[in-house]
């Protein structure tokens, strides 16, 4: 189940993650807010899954870009429920080497047809729109080291039954949950 997989991923973090990311932030040209710095420094310290919650305009996609650039040498997959959301990620994420972008249904269909690839890090945007069924299928098919789940719990919900994104926060260490609250656009 979704919760079982999330709990397994949350059992341990990436060794020396916090120190490495602090060094990257100190030497980066990005003007990263304190809110995002704190989240970046802890998100994978105790877990291999991290969740980013935030309303529209709080900088979730910008934050995805920071994470992507920190992990720029790694293979990355960006998923979203809709094609417009996938295209938005393509436009706004600058870490373009070894990246793939697609809808979660396209990913699930490809992998059901045995086109398998291992990724270092997978990002799923607009998680509140992904149904329990699609997420369960994704978790059964995907091969990855790190998982970043991004969304707005106030956004339109999944058309099919999908409460997993709101529920998983209770199964993660506090350091793996990032709640973006400061609005950057209105």
What are these regions (language model features)?
Residues 1-186:
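Conserved ATP-binding/catalytic motifs of P-loop helicase motor domains
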């Amino acid at each position: 189940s979704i919760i079982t997989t999330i709990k397994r991923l949350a059992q341990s973090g990436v060794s020396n993650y916090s120190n490495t990311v602090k060094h990257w932030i100190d030497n980066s040209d990005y003007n990263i807010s304190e809110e995002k710095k704190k989240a970046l420094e802890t998100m994978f310290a105790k877990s291999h899954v991290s969740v980013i919650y935030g309303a529209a305009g709080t900088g979730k996609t910008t934050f995805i870009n920071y994470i992507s650039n920190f992990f720029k040498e790694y293979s990355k997959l960006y998923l979203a429920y809709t094609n417009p959301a996938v295209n938005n990620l393509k436009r706004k994420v600058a870490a373009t080497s070894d990246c793939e972008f697609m809808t979660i249904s396209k990913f699930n269909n490809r992998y059901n047809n045995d086109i398998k690839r291992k990724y270092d890090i997978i990002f799923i945007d607009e998680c509140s729109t992904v149904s329990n069924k699609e997420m369960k299928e994704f978790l059964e098919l995907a091969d990855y080291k790190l998982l970043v789940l991004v969304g707005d719990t106030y956004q339109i919900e999944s058309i099919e039954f999908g409460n997993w994104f709101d529920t998983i926060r209770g199964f993660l260490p506090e350091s793996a949950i990032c709640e973006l609250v400061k609005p950057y656009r209105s």
